[in-house]
């Protein structure tokens, strides 16, 4: 996660102690732990045609005003209503008239200073650019058949194959054949093709065979001005404003609050009908700015961690870090996740910089989600950008994942064992034929669990296994952050030929998709996308980020390989053992001579597989390698950059040749 804005690093006049004199609502707290906690839901608006009730938790406020507007932007409030302080620091009021179609904001007075308009921390509908909350008829936001929408079945997290995408990347290019380019609705269009008459869009996803689409941040964010969408500005969206509203820039009309809501639901519904689950990228670890954030304008200081000198902690690297351990921030995060599940039928969550959050909060989120549906996935980045202002042993870091059952993290060990150090793009590793990364790759192959043949003292980043179960590890070689795969190969192997790049691209993803754990693919890798060598394209133009769908034709061989590789994994449970003991019993590394060669055996019909024994070998040398195998008659299904489950010939052992810069898979 990266964004490039400059942020205020000082909290300003707000301190932990808040004293308000000469006020009928004077409150004095010596620590954030003493702030009252609102009971029940954090709902801030309840509408009926006869009256609308408003609520705002702001325990340190001297006064709170409700501002009513006719429009989502511009103009002045047509009515101002003074709110009354109720229980547990919650201010309330009721407006006894029909407010449908109106907009509202709150303004909080603290230490004799009005903080400025905020839609609250929990708005569910907003006007353009999210400055004001909207009062809408929610029944009009449900597409036809929404009540019968169901998430596709999923037996185990090991069965997941995640496809990470950005809305604009996936559909905005002129070659996509998609009408609603860069919009939620792009993922509802069937029958779209490129110039070679090959499927694009949602049909492409079905053809590829992925099970989950991971959407980069899709809740309301700051960096795109929704009033200037014709200027085609781009951003990943890791600068959150309103956490519980879809972003308007991906809708066909950001001025109408119901449009973004309905179109987001249409997208989810279409993906579900196509057999694909939907994962949201959520960014609870920081806000776009601090002093003007909805959190800060509502309860100054409370939602952020501070250093001892009162300045903002910055574990996110973006100017602030949220305080997930505080009761109301924890409550907010739990309710937010549950809201996206209930209202939008979301099937999973990827937590940006999850290492900023505390373990207890993440476990409470997992427990709350389990009560709805335990197959809803939760995974995240098991690290932070800088050291958070919280005890390290209580943070949701990768090394602590054993204390978070049912939550997964990305394996940078496998990624960098294959590609090289992510921050040193010219340095290669296993794929580049650089020796020394083999044990890190093996660590990823077993799913980051304890395995008798994996020596963690030779693993790049972890001196001990951190996963209790292989399904706590996400395996990948590329994502939106850093270089995409082909750019990484070019940077670390400047002399590589186009043919070698293709071979190594296939080899890399074969490691990912035959490893235990949860495989993850960056959108466009299946057609060998590039981003012109840019490793932080968070605000680069479409010319850099968009998938050129002509590549599906020119790189058809690569797409076919990915498709067949995915099908191979889905068809054979040996590659999807969700249990650590099963992995230790059935996965055995074979002895090899020299470096840059890794081989393993999935034996004894692992996980009930129809294949009795499976041999998998990865050779990153430029020359063929000899591999000793158990004697038997094997059918080759992957060799020299080609996959065909019908067979590519047979081998009998006790020795087999593994072609250079490629994978070999065979079974008996």
Name what the model sees in each region.
Residues 58, 101-104, 648-668:
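C-terminal beta-strand-rich structural cap/linker in extracellular carbohydrate-active enzymes
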């Amino acid at each position: 996660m990266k964004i490039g804005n400059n942020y205020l690093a000082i909290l300003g006049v707000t301190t932990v102690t808040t004293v308000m004199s000469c006020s009928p609502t004077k409150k004095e707290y010596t620590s954030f732990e003493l702030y009252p906690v609102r009971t029940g839901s954090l709902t801030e608006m309840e509408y009926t045609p006869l009256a609308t009730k408003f609520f705002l938790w702001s325990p340190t406020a001297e006064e709170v005003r409700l501002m009513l507007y006719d429009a989502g932007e511009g103009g002045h409030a047509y009515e101002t209503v003074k709110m009354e302080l109720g229980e547990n620091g919650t201010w309330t009021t009721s407006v006894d008239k029909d407010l449908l179609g109106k907009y509202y904001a709150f303004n909080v007075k603290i230490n004799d200073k009005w903080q400025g308009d905020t839609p609250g921390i929990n708005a569910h509908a907003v006007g353009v650019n999210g400055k004001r909350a909207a009062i809408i008829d929610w029944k009009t936001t449900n597409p036809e058949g929404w009540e019968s929408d169901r998430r596709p079945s999923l037996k185990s997290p090991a069965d997941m194959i995640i496809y990470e995408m950005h809305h604009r990347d996936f559909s905005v290019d002129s070659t996509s054949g998609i009408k609603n380019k860069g919009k939620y609705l792009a993922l509802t269009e069937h029958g779209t093709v490129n110039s070679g008459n090959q499927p694009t869009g949602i049909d492409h996803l079905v053809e590829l065979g992925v099970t989950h689409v991971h959407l980069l941040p899709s809740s309301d964010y700051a960096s795109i001005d929704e009033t200037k969408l014709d200027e085609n500005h781009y951003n990943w969206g890791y600068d959150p404003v309103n956490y519980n509203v879809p972003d308007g820039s991906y809708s066909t009309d950001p001025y109408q609050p119901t449009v973004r809501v309905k179109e987001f639901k249409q997208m989810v519904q279409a993906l579900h009908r196509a057999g694909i689950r939907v994962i949201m990228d959520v960014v609870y670890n920081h806000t776009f700015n601090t002093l003007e954030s909805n959190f800060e304008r509502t309860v100054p200081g409370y939602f952020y961690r501070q250093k001892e000198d009162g300045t903002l902690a910055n574990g996110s690297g973006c100017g602030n870090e949220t305080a997930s351990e505080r009761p109301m921030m924890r409550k907010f995060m739990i309710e937010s996740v549950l809201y996206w599940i209930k209202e939008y039928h979301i099937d999973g969550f990827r937590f940006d910089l999850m290492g900023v959050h505390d373990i207890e909060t993440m476990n409470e989120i997992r427990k709350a989600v389990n009560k709805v549906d335990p197959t809803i996935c939760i995974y995240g980045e098991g690290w932070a950008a800088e050291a958070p202002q919280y005890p390290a042993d209580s943070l949701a870091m990768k090394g602590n994942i054993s204390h978070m059952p049912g939550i997964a993290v990305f394996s940078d060990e496998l990624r960098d064992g294959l590609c090289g150090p992510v921050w040193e793009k010219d340095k290669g590793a296993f794929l580049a034929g650089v020796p020394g990364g083999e044990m890190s790759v093996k660590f990823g192959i077993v799913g980051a669990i304890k395995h008798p043949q994996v020596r963690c003292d030779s693993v790049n980043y972890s001196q001990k296994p951190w996963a209790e179960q292989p399904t706590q590890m996400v395996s990948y070689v590329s994502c939106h952050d850093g270089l995409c795969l082909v750019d990484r190969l070019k940077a670390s192997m400047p002399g590589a030929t186009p043919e070698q790049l293709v071979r190594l691209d296939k080899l890399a993803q074969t490691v990912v998709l035959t490893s235990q754990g949860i495989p993850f693919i960056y959108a466009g890798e299946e057609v060998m996308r590039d981003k012109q060598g840019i490793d932080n394209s968070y605000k680069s133009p479409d010319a850099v980020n968009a998938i050129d769908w002509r590549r599906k034709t020119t790189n058809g061989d690569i797409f076919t390989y990915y498709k067949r590789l995915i099908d191979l994994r889905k068809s054979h449970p040996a590659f999807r053992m969700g249990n650590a003991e099963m992995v230790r019993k059935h996965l055995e590394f074979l002895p090899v001579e020299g470096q840059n060669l890794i081989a393993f055996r999935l034996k004894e019909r692992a996980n009930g597989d129809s294949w009795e024994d499976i041999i998998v070998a990865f050779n990153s040398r430029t020359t063929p390698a000899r591999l000793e195998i158990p004697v038997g008659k094997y059918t080759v299904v992957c060799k020299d950059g080609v996959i065909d489950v019908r067979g590519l010939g047979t081998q009998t052992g006790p020795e087999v040749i593994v072609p250079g810069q490629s994978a070999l898979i065979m079974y008996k």
